[in-house]
Regions:
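C-terminal beta-signal and terminal closure region of outer-membrane beta-barrel proteins
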Residues: 1-12, 103, 115, 164-198
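Flexible loop/turn segments at secondary-structure boundaries
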Residues: 61, 68-72, 163-166
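Extracytoplasmic gating/loop element in the C-terminal half of outer-membrane beta-barrel translocons
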Residues: 10, 67-154, 159
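Surface-exposed loop/turn segments flanking beta-strands in extracellular/periplasmic regions
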Residues: 23-28, 81-95, 173-183
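Membrane-embedded beta-strand positions of outer-membrane beta-barrel proteins
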Residues: 62, 155-157, 194
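Outer-membrane beta-barrel pore domains and translocons
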Residues: 54, 65-67, 158-162, 197
């Protein structure tokens, strides 16, 4: 349940909401005007898939995970896109679009207007992520015979969380939470290695 954000009035830079009856208002009243959003924290659709191929000594394996229909409240934007928080927190580059004069079309109210905990913070956190990528190359046996000691040799690369496609503007759409507030994201990881068998 949240109050529905209706944008910023281009005439005076004040935020607007829809009240419980669907009328525009500039008075935020969470108790009276909160409505069921129909959005859910848990994705009704989720899954994963993988693919692999090999050619001669080269092999590539990739694993993906996805979720669809998941929503999260991006509370980072409450602090990073809020003119009243500018002296306490770093601000997002979007703050360059803050309302400054009549006629400005923006979703960021003028300085002095408090951002509220409404639907403009609720975001689609559906995503597709490459979870793992493994690329390895095994050297030909005839090359190893020439070494007179090494039976097998291969080099490999492992990458984790290399790619994420999402509309979510926060750092990471994957955590199993309904509200993000400067949470550490899943990190990208890179591993290079060599395996020798004597």
């Amino acid at each position: 349940y949240m109050v529905e954000f209706a944008g910023v009035d281009p005439r005076d830079g004040k935020p607007m909401w829809y009240d419980i009856d669907g009328n525009l208002t500039k008075v935020y009243n969470e108790e009276r005007d909160s409505k069921f959003t129909g959005k859910q924290r848990y994705a009704p659709w989720s899954g994963g898939f993988g693919t692999s191929f090999s050619w001669k000594g080269l092999s590539v394996t990739a694993d993906f995970a996805w979720q669809h229909g998941k929503y999260m409240i991006n509370n980072d934007n409450y602090f990073m896109k809020n003119a009243n928080q500018g002296t306490s927190y770093n601000q997002a580059v979007d703050m360059l679009n803050i309302w400054t004069k009549p006629g400005d079309i923006t979703d960021i109210p003028k300085y002095g207007e408090q951002i509220q905990f409404d639907t403009h913070l609720l975001e689609d956190a559906s995503f597709l992520r490459m979870k793992n990528l493994i690329v390895q190359y095994s050297f030909p046996k005839k090359w190893m015979q020439a070494t007179k000691g090494i039976q097998n040799a291969k080099v490999f690369f492992v990458g984790r969380n290399l790619f994420t496609a999402t509309k979510f503007s926060g750092y990471d759409p994957e955590p199993d939470i309904n509200l993000v507030k400067f949470n550490y994201p899943n990190t990208r990881q890179f591993v290079f290695g060599m395996e020798l068998t004597f």
